[in-house]
């Protein structure tokens, strides 16, 4: 009875939703990327219902588009791209994951994941490399023109420690879970579900901190 009285408070709030990854990239020339997996984490002490919505449902097949995640567990959601055509290159689609408590209908929280179809991974890498070079040249020119040793301003961007922690959390989420038999990764690098839940929670906090800077 005490838990039922707390449900309206949960409904009124904006419950953080932990999903990895937050971006899906499909490559037309690599069929292995046409099927990707979203992992929904539930670090809470109550079960969550989830529902996956999409801005262009005719382009994708979502396996288990609705279901439930037990407390302190995770759920893999398989997404397949079924309309790989050149006219869709570069178009940004969005998936929205809505979660609610099992006894409630109103969404407690939501998370958006963007999806993009690109022609080739090699072309994407080339474009990213060219972009990085241009950004590096622009930054170098800016510092050469405006650098003043006696009156430098402190950067408001994320610290190296924050970036390092984010990389560690992302790496932890990408490592296999305990019980994955087919993985080639050594067993001592397999993490438990609880460890991944902690990593997802910390990554969420870091992301919010970065957006506030």
From Swiss-Prot:
Disulphide-bonded residues: none
InterPro entries: Ig-like_fold, MOSPD1/3, MSP_dom, PapD-like_sf
Membrane topology value: Multi-pass membrane protein
Keyword Membrane part of the UniProt annotation: yes
Organism superkingdom: Eukaryota
Segments carrying motif Nuclear export signal: 205-208
PROSITE patterns: MSP
The name this protein goes by in its record: Motile sperm domain-containing protein 1
Species of the source: Bos taurus (Bovine)
Gene expressing this chain: MOSPD1
């Amino acid at each position: 009875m005490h838990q039922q009285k707390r449900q309206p408070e949960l409904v009124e709030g904006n419950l953080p939703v932990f999903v990895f990854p937050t971006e899906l990239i499909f490559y037309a020339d690599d069929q292995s990327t046409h099927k990707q997996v979203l992992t929904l984490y539930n670090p809470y002490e109550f079960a969550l219902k989830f529902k996956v919505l999409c801005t262009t449902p005719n382009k994708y097949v979502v396996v288990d588009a609705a279901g439930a995640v037990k407390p302190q567990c995770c759920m893999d959601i398989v997404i397949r791209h079924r309309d790989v055509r050149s006219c869709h290159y570069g178009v940004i689609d969005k998936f929205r994951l809505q979660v609610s408590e099992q006894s409630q209908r109103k969404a407690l929280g939501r998370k958006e994941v963007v999806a993009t179809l690109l022609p080739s991974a090699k072309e994407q890498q080339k474009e990213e490399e060219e972009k990085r070079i241009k950004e590096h040249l622009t930054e170098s020119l800016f510092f050469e023109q405006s650098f003043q040793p006696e009156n430098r301003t402190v950067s408001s961007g994320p610290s190296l420690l924050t970036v390092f922690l984010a990389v560690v959390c992302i790496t932890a989420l990408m490592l296999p879970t305990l019980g994955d038999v087919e993985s080639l990764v050594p067993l001592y690098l397999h993490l438990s579900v609880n460890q991944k839940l902690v990593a997802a929670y910390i990554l969420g906090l870091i992301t919010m901190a970065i957006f506030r800077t």
